[in-house]
Amino acid sequence: MSIYKLSAPLTLLNGKEITELNLDYEALTLSDLRTANKIVSMIGDSMVGNIDNGTLSPRLDPNLRTAIAFVAAIKGTPGLRIDDVLKVSMVDALCLGEDCMSNYLFK
C-alpha cells in the first residue's frame, strides 16, 4: 500500500476531511475495472478531453490511469467513495495517474 498526500484537503460525502489517500493496488481485481470505467465516464462528463498525466504509455487512456489509482484509493481509504472523485483537485488527479503508472502498472 502506498500513501499519497493530497495537495488540498478533501471533504468526503460523509463530511470527514482527509489529507491523504491510501492506495491499495494489491487489493485490485479484474472486477474493479468496471468501477474504473465508471470513473472514466465521470471524468469525461466533467471535462473536455483527457487528463494528460504523462507519456509513459500512450496506449493506456490517461483517464483510466487516474481511475485505477482512485479505485486503489477507495480500496485503501476508509470512507472514500466513487462520487468523491470529482472533488479531487486537478493537480492530485494528474499525480494519481502518474502514481498508477509507477507504482502499479510498471512496478
Descriptions of predicted regions:
Residues 1-107:
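Short, surface-exposed, charged amphipathic helix/loop patches that serve as local interaction elements
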